[in-house]
């Protein structure tokens, strides 16, 4: 959608993170209940690091991993990292076998009443804008809550 492509262009052009708001606006407080979409890739790690000032002040932080292999890790490596930095996070491993990754994210936003989604924007500049795919396109085209995104 146009909203998703415009959001991707903002992130890519800025060279830094961006806060993407739902097209209809958003009035409630942002950042009290944070959901981090985690897949263990560089972009997810960058988004987590860039959003740290918000994450550190949140009342609740939920880290959503699609599988134990996504480096949130069966050994809890990411969770221990967050705790060492003063953030007690709830690790959610939710493979959603009959859902797309975007549907799993949306379901967990509702389940945990999240008011901010933190996620990495995956891909390469021009190609990303042309074929903004999968999870990024779905989430950014109609975000139900504000989305903090980094590339």
Predicted stretch roles:
Residues 84-117, 121-130, 137, 145:
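Structural beta-alpha unit
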Residues 40-92, 96, 103:
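Redox- and metal-dependent alpha/beta enzyme cores, enriched for Fe-S-associated oxidoreductases
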Residues 4, 132-133:
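Glycine-centered tight-turn and secondary-structure capping sites
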Residues 10-11, 82, 109, 140:
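A generic structural signal for well-ordered alpha-helical segments
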Residues 41, 134-136:
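Short linear Ser/Thr-Pro motifs
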Residues 1-60, 64-65, 142-151:
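Intrinsically disordered or low-complexity boundary/linker segments at protein termini
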Residues 17-25, 74-75, 80, 115-125, ...:
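A short, terminal or domain-edge coil/loop segment
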């Amino acid at each position: 959608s146009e909203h998703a492509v415009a959001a991707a262009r903002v992130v890519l052009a800025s060279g830094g993170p961006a806060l993407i708001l739902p097209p209809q606006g958003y009035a409630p407080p942002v950042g009290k209940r944070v959901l981090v979409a985690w897949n263990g890739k560089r972009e997810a790690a960058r988004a987590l690091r860039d959003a740290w000032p918000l994450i550190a002040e949140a009342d609740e932080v939920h880290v959503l991993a699609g599988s134990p292999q996504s480096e949130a890790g069966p050994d809890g490596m990411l969770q221990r990292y967050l705790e060492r930095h003063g953030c007690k996070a709830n690790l959610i491993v939710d493979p959603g076998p009959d859902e797309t990754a975007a549907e799993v994210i949306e379901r967990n936003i509702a389940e945990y009443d999240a008011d901010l989604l933190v996620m990495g924007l995956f891909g390469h500049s021009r190609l990303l804008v042309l074929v903004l795919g999968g999870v990024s396109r779905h989430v950014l085209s109609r975000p139900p809550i504000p989305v903090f995104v980094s590339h």
